[in-house]
């Protein structure tokens, strides 16, 4: 396995639905990638992750409740959402006791991808997640290539299709950036071969956001310190948050390459790898509304 090839392959796979499954609702492009942080605890402490420092990202053991999951599922159905919901976020999703219910409920409204370290996974759970209609199970292997044999046996024993599970090589050292698309998590960590923090365009808030365990909505998964909330899912609906003033402010600034506010001003994430179509549409919308020039017509 090759870490760079793994990363490129994952980006290409995600691009199929992130960039090509765009839905226009009331004249604006809906997000196509929604990340859920189901539980604020992880059983690992990887050095490239803020969870390795309890002063930055302590385990609180708080978890998302069923009411929020039910509300999210209903709203995605109403919006005719065509993107993906990713279960990962700030903790290990398989530690949530309702993971099967959550997967099954969200799968009625969306593609569901689960990102896990695989530590608590067994063949029965793998089969249950498949039966709950999860689209993909992505297993990040941190211990070494010997894990490949273990998980391939698990796939065979569970009798799920081979392409349901994606094994990702993440066992590399700091010299190879641990096999991940390394960032400083919006200025939270400084390890590995970090790229220089240059103020460049970012498409993240044009096509995605993250929902925390309590319903707080954040720009993207880079904001590990939870510095700026866009709204709360338990108090508002997704669409109103998505087109609201907080998102608009950050979206407009980042489309201009202006990383001037927290958490963006400390972030070195390369934010243009996905979401170009969304960004182009948002530019037309803002050009039309705020500058009085011809742009995308809003119905």
Placement of each model-derived feature along the sequence:
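Conserved alpha-helical substructure of the radical SAM core
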Residues: 2-136, 274-299
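Exposed loop/turn and edge beta-strand positions of beta-sandwich/beta-sheet ligand-binding modules
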Residues: 32, 205, 224
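Processing junctions and N-termini across compartments
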Residues: 36, 40-43, 196, 258-261
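Short cysteine clusters
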Residues: 42, 46-49, 202, 220, ...
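Conserved AdoMet/S-adenosylmethionine-binding subsite of the radical SAM
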Residues: 73, 96-206
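C-terminal accessory region of radical SAM enzymes
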Residues: 156-192, 222-274
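Short, acidic, Ser/Thr-enriched surface-loop or helix-capping motifs
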Residues: 211-212
